[in-house]
């Protein structure tokens, strides 16, 4: 399962998180056809103390499975750091879903709105600064138009309101290269978390996992630059 390899790679050296990843993925595989209530009861036992890890794992997987009650996952998260991280991760997963044509707008929009509402109440600065200042803007080839449009939809809801929305939207459309920018935002958050929890990012040193990460993240050749 490539999702496992990717997650283990990202969280490898965070204390105690490797086992959490395995437990959550096991529950998802074993009980994916059970009722949502049963899933919530099982998964809620893993939410604390690693709330952030549980959220970032469950949110994208729940989107892929089209769960009806994504609200449960967003309701348990209130701290600013996790909301910041979740907003970035949600945007990144729009790329994943749209690439494989699995994006169901109503499910995605529900999750994005829930995170965005909380996020906008807790912090005022715009994430767009990360987007427009990224050196990666000029490094990669253009995305197909339909995927770009899907991502623009995501950006519109995740990062609204923002003071410079019109200017930055125009900049993104002009560049037409949003995939690596979104990924860069996620990596920025990984760097912040790494300063607090991680000794070293496994992808920096392990060539085999780095290659698999490249394949997972749509072969954009970004992971090697992390």
UniProtKB/Swiss-Prot annotation:
Signal sequence, start to end: 1-16
UniProt keyword Glycoprotein present: yes
Residues with glycosylation annotation: 164
Presence of keyword Signal: yes
Assigned keywords, A-Z: Glycoprotein, Host-virus interaction, Inhibition of host NF-kappa-B by virus, Signal
Coiled-coil stretches noted in the UniProt entry, renumbered to this chain: none
GO biological process annotation, one example: symbiont-mediated suppression of host NF-kappaB cascade
Regulation: induction: Expressed in the intermediate phase of the viral replicative cycle (immediately after DNA replication).
Superkingdom classification of source: Viruses
Family, similarity comment: Belongs to the asfivirus I226R family.
Stated role: Plays a role in the inhibition of host NF-kappa-B and IRF3 signaling pathways. Mechanistically, promotes the degradation of host IKBKG through enhancing its ubiquitination leading to inhibition of both pathways.
Official protein name in the record: Late protein I226R
Organism: African swine fever virus (isolate Tick/Malawi/Lil 20-1/1983)
